[in-house]
């Protein structure tokens, strides 16, 4: 969340008259790989591990086709898949033992205490941030935030009326695997285009803010005082 706040601050720090060629979507001194954490997940999303990235797309596509067109419930399909995998592994182990063949050692899946504490701390910070936002929206302290939340929820409602949750998750997975890699490849062109769009949107938002939002906020605060 801190990185997103830094980006928002970077947006606000640019004046409207700035050139779109100077615009940087992720900041001036950060790469896409660094912005995404620089770990194995970033390597996967940026196609530095092509076989894993391609595997994610294939598995996501197969899963989407199964759940979307078969009509089978998620719990039933997941249980059947796990059952088949466990049975195959068990039979393979028994056959190998019967033939006195050595099994390939499987890696142990163990979460370290440091990893769990780090994930819990990160989740706590993000959850507290969301709770603060929810409090500000419900009590009416920040009208601009309320306006943004209403627009986002309305868009989600409109999208959800046409697209199922399974399809929405599939689209999100495909976009998360393709967009970062494409942006990393065409970063300069995308930054230039986004700079132009951002400058125009900032101009229109300034007009709406001065003529509508600021007046509504002033009238609401006046009603509270009275």
From Swiss-Prot:
Q: Name one GO cellular component term.
A: endoplasmic reticulum membrane
Q: Which residues form the signal peptide?
A: none
Residues forming the Reticulon domain are 41-224
Does the record carry Transmembrane as a key word?
A: yes
- What GO terms describe the biological role, i.e. biological process, of this protein? response to bacterium
Where are its TM segments located? 54-74, 75-95, 149-169
Q: How does it sit in the membrane?
A: Multi-pass membrane protein
UniProt entry tagged with the keyword Endoplasmic reticulum: yes
Protein name (record): Reticulon-like protein B16
Which keywords fit this entry according to its UniProt record?
Answer: Endoplasmic reticulum, Membrane, Transmembrane, Transmembrane helix
Q: Which PANTHER family match?
A: RETICULON, RETICULON-LIKE PROTEIN B16
- The gene behind this protein is RTNLB16
The record's subcellular locations are: Endoplasmic reticulum membrane
* Pfam families named among the record's database cross-references: Reticulon
Q: Which InterPro entries match?
A: Reticulon, Reticulon-like
